[in-house]
A protein has these predicted regions:
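Flexible "cap/lid" loop of the alpha/beta hydrolase fold
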Residues: 137, 141, 150-179
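Short beta-strand immediately N-terminal to the catalytic nucleophile in serine-hydrolase-like folds
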Residues: 126-128, 153, 250
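Conserved acidic catalytic loop of the alpha/beta-hydrolase fold
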Residues: 93-102, 106-124
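Alpha/beta-hydrolase
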Residues: 165-238, 242
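Conserved HGGG/HGGXW glycine-rich cap/lid loop of the alpha/beta-hydrolase fold
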Residues: 19-95
């Protein structure tokens, strides 16, 4: 589902208002079909859901929606909000001290539901990866009348000590470009490190995706704000226990 990226150019984004912000989005398929809304992960843009994959879902009689989260890509960047110190915030949160974050995962769940409102979609299958899985968990639980199902991919419930990256993976994710290395080369290296050895993706495909995201809009301060929302999010187990819809964990 990624091979089309090597030959992909341009962007099919439209724009929609939600929760007081402007979001870039794209749709596939007939609007009369059941909707799927795809929510991307931390610092990821909607193109992480490959166009070919979206067309495949549409061919299975779904109306597919993908979009850029706030603070990334072609959606509004929260430039008026200070980029936080992640270390300081995590220490405060762990010791039960008040933490001021620019926005929360609940805000991003409201963004997601607001996009459905803007498209006049009453209900949707919520599908999210990584941070997007967290957002979909909240959206499905907080807005139960809008959710047909939940699919949470490579994500977590927020339970302390569960679903956390290894120290080696954490250090790799924070790795800055080495001397003479471009930001794109560094990003390709990080993504290949994090990728599954069981489902390898060629460097050329990963590079095409990274180059596309950089061309659309890379926002390092947005990464810090999104990460702050993740790091300070409360445990979602009680929310997940309230779900009355089909749920798939991948």
């Amino acid at each position: 589902g990624l091979k089309d990226l090597e030959n992909y150019s341009g962007d099919e984004s439209s724009y929609i208002s939600s929760n007081g912000l402007r979001f870039a989005y794209g749709t596939f398929g007939n609007k009369s079909n059941p909707a799927i809304i795809l929510v991307a992960g931390l610092y990821n843009q909607m193109v992480r859901w490959p166009t070919e994959f979206c067309h495949d879902l549409a061919a299975r009689n779904f109306f597919v929606i993908r979009f850029d989260n706030r603070d990334i890509g072609l959606s509004n960047w929260m430039t008026g909000l200070k980029a936080p110190s992640l270390v300081r915030q995590m220490l405060k949160y762990r010791f039960g001290l008040p933490v001021d974050v620019p926005y929360t995962l609940d805000d991003m769940a409201a963004d997601t539901v607001g996009i459905l409102d803007g498209l006049s979609v009453k209900k949707a299958h919520f599908v999210g990866m990584s941070m997007g899985g967290m957002i979909c968990q909240i959206a499905a639980a907080r807005y139960p009348d809008r959710a047909l199902s939940l699919t949470s991919i490579m994500s977590t419930s927020g339970t302390f000590g569960k679903g956390k990256p290894s120290l080696k993976a954490s250090m790799q994710m924070l790795k800055k470009p080495s001397k003479g290395q471009s930001r794109i080369d560094n990003s390709v290296e990080i993504l290949q490190f994090l990728g599954s050895p069981g489902y390898p993706v060629s460097d050329s495909v990963v590079r095409a995706m990274v180059e596309l995201e950089y061309a659309r809009g890379s926002n390092p301060a947005g990464y810090l704000r999104q990460m702050a929302a993740i790091n300070t999010a409360p445990n979602r187990v009680h929310l997940l226990n309230s779900l009355k819809i089909p749920a798939l964990i991948i």
